[in-house]
């Protein structure tokens, strides 16, 4: 067997940069906002070399200001005191609702795709203004004031958006907790944020199942005297929902008491708009703080320029407002621009795998933004449904949440986009607020597997994690950092600014540390390697787990792979791969004769040889564990921490598993590791 030479960003040498298909240009409602790569480079260089001039122009063009700012930007990454648009006054709710309602009240704002399609509805900007004003009035009547936090625990329904905008309207701070979190997780976030008001619903509906949302809230807040009011929306109208007198109030009853217009409160640009809790390396969640002016501008600019969004477009972001994707690209980005946003309550599999494509056909969606996890699911079991529907309205296909592998990128382009759409593989995070690395649709040529180029104002760099020195030029790999502030970056961690500094600004002084590994290829394009703690070092070789995972996933029988590094006395670390297989093929309990006579040992041997051939002998997994499924968070990401602990024989130290969407797989994984790994070591 010939082992190919290992190259820096080696996969970049196997793909070509692709220009936007002609269909993209033919279907544009108007001229593109950025016309080509040269135009992007000119704008990008100005945003880096003259950031105050660049963002001053953008802020005045895209946002309505009640009072002008006196300085565009102050502070530094070194000191952790970054501020934008100082002394400027504005309101997020006004920017997202009022100005569009006044100009075009009958234009669709929210397109609600309910769990049951018979419950679908459209809310115009005029209706949205009235509904937001009423809930804002309720909160104001309860004494909620500027600077207070309000917790929102709602499924992906229009009322979640209404609640967020209502909180922002009165200058308060919303703290959305994903409605799939446990009672204990909800309690932790409510207490940490000091939220005295919680907004929830009686029950949720998802995938044809009913979720006892109010019951979870009651359990989580039992004994929490901090919470004085709970506003409950009737999602199902089921009778007998427990309501605590003096604390719990029905949404529809309280809203009916309020006027349908409440003037918005003028906020400082640096006033917090929201908190959003994200997992920390210590296991305790941290409340990331985003401010009003800078965040809104980042949301608007990336939605406009990355997706080439026009006012007539329809954006379908298949993400929940419980996560940053829903905040930025289902709510604040499109609504700031006055663009219709699809709010999707259900799952891609309910009532069948044609759901996404029916939504696109029904509403003539022009943009579809989804996580690779959902795409892998559809590719595995639901691909045949795509061709049944007319998806020709699509112009841009986005990917979010994790790097999308080149093969899945190609499948997305061919099967979903019919080779007519631009693929926008976007790299960003809760803390960045909006896109960091992403192609500008129609202007920047794309490469399968690459997030491509930095967005305006993102002064991206690659740092050697050992020396801390920036790596100049192309064909380099290291950790991804940003060396100057940008408007939508998080300003702090709620009540723990020291944690903010320690996590993001102190690891590489003068830089914002993303926590991700990355490579910059020969063309200057960025390839995201995943979290730095998902990089293993075997005998001095730094290996990206995503690189090994991609190699294993190329096998025809493999559905998905997750690679972790565990301690090894000889090599420092060794590679362990967990592999789930396609339906109809070998499963983790397979025996001789299953799956066309492919035995477990034969399959493991094939996969190891494949990695050796595609990357090098040093990257070969020491063992491959065959499992039925992998543990995932509720946002769809693989929880590699669990896999690492189990393979390290530390199953009793798994820590908090409340964010797992499928905790039932953990015992099976422990058993598989015991049978396939530890038992072999004992022989």
From Swiss-Prot:
CDD domains: ACS. There is a cross-link at residue 506 (Glycyl lysine isopeptide (Lys-Gly) (interchain with G-Cter in ubiquitin)). PROSITE patterns: AMP_BINDING. GO terms for biological process: acetyl-CoA biosynthetic process; acetyl-CoA biosynthetic process from acetate; pyruvate metabolic process. It is an enzyme of class 6 (ligase). Pathway: Carbohydrate metabolism; pyruvate metabolism. AMP binds at residues 425-430, 516, 531. GO terms for molecular function: acetate-CoA ligase activity; acid-ammonia (or amide) ligase activity; AMP binding; ATP binding. GO terms for cellular component: cytosol; nucleolus; nucleus. Pfam families: ACAS_N, AMP-binding, AMP-binding_C. Keywords: ATP-binding, Cytoplasm, Isopeptide bond, Ligase, Nucleotide-binding, Nucleus, Phosphoprotein, Ubl conjugation. Its EC number is 6.2.1.1. Transmembrane segments: none annotated. Catalyzes the production of acetyl-CoA. Provides the acetyl-CoA source for histone acetylation in the nucleus. 'Anaerobic' isozyme of acetyl-coenzyme A synthetase, which is required for growth on fermentable carbon sources such as glucose. May be involved in the PDH (pyruvate dehydrogenase complex) bypass. PANTHER family: ACETYL-COENZYME A SYNTHETASE, ACETYL-COENZYME A SYNTHETASE 2. Present with 225000 molecules/cell in log phase SD medium. This is Acetyl-coenzyme A synthetase 2.
């Amino acid at each position: 067997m010939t082992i190919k030479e290992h190259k820096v960003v080696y996969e970049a040498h196997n793909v070509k940069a692709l220009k936007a298909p002609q269909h993209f240009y033919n279907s544009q409602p108007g001229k593109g906002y950025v016309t080509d790569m040269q135009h992007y480079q000119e704008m990008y260089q100005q945003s880096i070399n003259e950031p105050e001039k660049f963002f001053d122009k953008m802020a005045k063009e895209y946002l309505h200001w009640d009072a002008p700012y006196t300085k565009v930007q102050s502070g530094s990454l070194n000191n952790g005191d970054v501020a934008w648009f100082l002394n400027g006054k504005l309101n997020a709710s006004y920017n997202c609702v009022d100005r569009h309602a006044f100009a075009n009240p009958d234009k669709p704002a929210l397109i609600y795709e309910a769990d049951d399609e018979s419950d679908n509805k459209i809310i115009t900007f005029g209706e949205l203004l009235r509904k937001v004003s009423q809930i804002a009035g309720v909160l104001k009547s309860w004494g909620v004031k500027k600077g207070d936090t309000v917790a929102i625990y709602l499924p992906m329904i229009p009322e979640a958006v209404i609640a967020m905008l209502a909180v922002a309207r009165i200058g308060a701070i919303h703290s959305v907790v994903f409605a799939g979190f446990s009672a204990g997780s909800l309690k932790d976030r409510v207490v940490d944020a000091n939220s005295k008001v919680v907004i929830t619903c009686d029950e949720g509906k998802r995938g044809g199942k009913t979720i006892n949302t109010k019951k979870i809230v009651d359990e989580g807040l039992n004994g929490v005297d901090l919470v004085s009011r709970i506003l409950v929306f009737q999602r199902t109208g089921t009778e007998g929902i427990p309501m605590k007198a003096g604390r719990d109030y029905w949404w529809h009853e309280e809203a009916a008491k309020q006027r349908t217009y409440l003037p918005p409160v003028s906020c400082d640009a640096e006033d917090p708009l929201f908190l959003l809790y994200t997992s920390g390396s210590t296991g305790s969640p941290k409340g990331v703080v985003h401010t009003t002016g800078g965040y809104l501008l980042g949301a608007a600019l990336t939605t406009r320029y990355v997706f080439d969004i026009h006012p007539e477009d329809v954006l379908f972001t298949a993400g929940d407002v419980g996560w940053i994707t829903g905040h930025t690209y289902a709510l604040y980005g499109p609504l700031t621009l006055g663009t219709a946003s699809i709010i999707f309550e259900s799952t891609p599999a309910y009532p069948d795998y044609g759901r996404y494509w029916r939504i696109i056909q029904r509403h003539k969606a022009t943009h579809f933004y989804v996580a690779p996890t959902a795409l892998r699911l559809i590719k595995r079991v639901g691909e045949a449904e795509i061709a049944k529907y007319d998806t020709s309205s699509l112009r841009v296909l986005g990917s979010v949440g994790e790097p999308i592998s080149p093969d899945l990128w190609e499948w997305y382009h061919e099967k979903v986009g019919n080779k007519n759409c631009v693929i926008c593989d976007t790299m960003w995070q809760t803390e960045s607020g909006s896109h960091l690395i992403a192609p500008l649709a129609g202007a920047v040529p794309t490469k399968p597997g690459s997030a491509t180029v930095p967005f305006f104002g993102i002064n991206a760099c690659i740092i050697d994690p050992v020396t801390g020195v920036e790596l100049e030029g192309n064909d380099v790999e290291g950790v991804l950092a940003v060396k100057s502030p940008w408007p939508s970056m998080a300003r702090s961690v709620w009540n723990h600014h020291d944690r903010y500094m320690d996590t993001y600004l102190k690891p590489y002084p003068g830089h914002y540390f993303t926590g991700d590994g990355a490579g910059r290829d020969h063309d200057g394009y960025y390839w995201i390697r995943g979290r730095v703690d998902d990089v293993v070092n075997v005998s001095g070789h730094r290996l990206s787990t995503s690189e090994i995972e991609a190699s294993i996933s190329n096998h025809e029988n493999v559905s998905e792979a997750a690679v972790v590094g565990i301690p090894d006395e000889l090599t420092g670390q060794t590679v362990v791969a967990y592999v789930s297989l396609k339906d109809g093929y070998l499963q983790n309990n397979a025996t001789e004769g299953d799956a066309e006579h492919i035995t477990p040992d034969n399959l493991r041997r094939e996969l190891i040889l494949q990695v050796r051939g595609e990357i090098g002998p040093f990257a070969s997994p020491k063992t491959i564990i065959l499992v039925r499924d992998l543990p995932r968070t509720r946002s769809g990401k693989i929880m590699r921490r669990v896999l690492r602990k189990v393979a390290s024989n530390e199953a009793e130290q798994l820590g908090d598993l409340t964010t797992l969407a499928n905790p039932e797989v953990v015992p099976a994984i422990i058993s598989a590791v015991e049978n396939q790994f530890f038992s072999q070591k004992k022989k």
